[in-house]
């Protein structure tokens, strides 16, 4: 079976969805800028050999509709003979794009893919046009479509306190800010145009959504937002609403080597799994267990982990049941996570994978895991191995 590898991986800065730096940039433009950048960064690659562009996006309507993958590819000047498809596994969409490219390579159905994803949550809100079938209420808890309430449920089931959530959120902001100041995001962020508060055109080079001033004292003043009477989940311990895109060049290993392109990571194993929709945030646990089993590994073999932080109340039960509570500061989200950086839905899977690969390189780590929960009760996981 052929080996799928990551040749390159980049992302945009994460922009704040409310009046942020990308308020005048469309989702197709965010995507196209990254596609173009991958080609510029890897001049040995002939664009005419691209088999397919596989792009994750959740809210596929308005500017994100009508197959945004194809729209962005055409904007980027990718040759018209290359295919393009938009995929939707909700929060796991761009990791699903990675998996689809990897499976195609493994089975000989192409050797060069551009993958990634985008979500402009400022232009197309997460709940835009959502209309659940009434019949779902017969066997699915009615609150399952309200992500914050599923986090409340999962946190209560695992005894996660408000204090623990606040501490986890502060850590996310502190680590993301430190990574920014120390230049640890520089290799993964592709600077693109945006607009400052006065409307002037600027080159956006850093994430906008990190709040370095976040403290336990400031978070303690916030009221529960999803269950005001009895809850513990606040806006401060939830992933920020943000706009962004991420992209990867995924190739068959021998093809990449023949072109003299770098092999930044191999895709060692992949998995998806389902769980009860009422505790959708638990999905990373069964997905990770399945991915590790397929790779013949245990959690002890994994050097670094990127776990998408949908909510602190959701992340901590996953960390606990994956046996990582005592290893968080050694292995988990060392540059912060979505609580600080935001969670542009269709972008996040490739974003956390990009951050993971860069961390693996900087730490000289061998094995890394990227995993995330998915709305309505799924999880997705990928094990990467440095060549």
From Swiss-Prot:
It comes from Shewanella loihica (strain ATCC BAA-1088 / PV-4). Keywords: Acyltransferase, Cytoplasm, Fatty acid metabolism, Lipid degradation, Lipid metabolism, Transferase. Catalyzes the final step of fatty acid oxidation in which acetyl-CoA is released and the CoA ester of a fatty acid two carbons shorter is formed. One of its GO terms (molecular function) is acetyl-CoA C-acyltransferase activity. The gene is fadA. This is 3-ketoacyl-CoA thiolase. One of its GO terms (cellular component) is cytoplasm. It is found in: Cytoplasm. Belongs to the thiolase-like superfamily. Thiolase family. Transmembrane segments: none annotated. The lineage of its organism: Bacteria, Pseudomonadati, Pseudomonadota, Gammaproteobacteria, Alteromonadales. Signal peptide: none annotated. Heterotetramer of two alpha chains (FadB) and two beta chains (FadA). The keyword Acyltransferase applies. It comes from the Bacteria. It catalyses: an acyl-CoA + acetyl-CoA = a 3-oxoacyl-CoA + CoA.
């Amino acid at each position: 079976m052929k080996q799928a590898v990551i040749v390159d991986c980049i992302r945009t800065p994460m922009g704040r969805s409310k009046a942020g730096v990308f308020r005048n940039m469309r989702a197709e433009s965010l995507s196209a800028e990254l596609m173009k950048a991958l080609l510029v960064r890897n001049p040995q690659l002939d664009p005419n050999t691209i088999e397919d562009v596989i792009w994750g996006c959740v809210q596929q309507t308005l500017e994100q509709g009508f197959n945004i993958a194809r729209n962005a590819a055409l904007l980027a000047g990718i040759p018209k003979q290359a295919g393009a498809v938009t995929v939707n596994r909700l929060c796991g969409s761009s990791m699903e794009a990675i998996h689809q490219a990897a499976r195609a390579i493994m089975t000989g159905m192409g050797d060069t893919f551009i993958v990634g994803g985008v979500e402009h949550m400022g232009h197309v809100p997460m709940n835009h046009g959502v209309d659940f079938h009434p019949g779902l209420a017969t066997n699915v808890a009615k609150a399952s479509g309200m992500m914050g309430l599923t986090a409340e449920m999962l946190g209560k089931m695992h005894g996660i306190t408000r204090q623990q959530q606040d501490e986890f959120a502060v850590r996310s902001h502190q680590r993301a800010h430190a990574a920014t100041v120390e230049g640890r995001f520089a290799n993964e962020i592709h600077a693109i145009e945006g607009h400052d508060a006065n409307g002037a055109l600027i080159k956006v080079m850093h994430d906008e959504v990190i709040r370095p001033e976040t403290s336990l004292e400031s978070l303690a003043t916030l009221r529960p937002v999803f269950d005001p009477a009895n809850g513990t989940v606040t806006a401060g311990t939830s992933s920020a609403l943000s706009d962004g895109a991420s992209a990867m060049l995924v190739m068959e290993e021998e093809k990449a080597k023949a072109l003299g392109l770098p092999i930044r990571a191999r895709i060692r194993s992949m998995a998806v799994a389902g769980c009860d929709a009422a505790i959708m945030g638990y999905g990373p646990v069964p997905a990770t267990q399945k991915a590790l089993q397929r790779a013949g590994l245990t959690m002890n073999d994994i050097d670094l982990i990127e776990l998408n932080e949908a909510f602190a109340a959701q992340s901590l039960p996953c960390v606990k049941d994956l046996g990582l509570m005592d290893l968080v500061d050694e292995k988990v989200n060392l540059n912060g996570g979505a609580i600080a950086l935001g969670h542009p839905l269709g972008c996040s899977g490739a974003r956390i994978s990009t951050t993971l690969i860069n961390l693996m390189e900087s730490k000289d780590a061998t094995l890394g895991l990227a995993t995330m929960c998915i709305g309505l009760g799924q999880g997705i996981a990928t094990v990467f191995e440095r060549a």
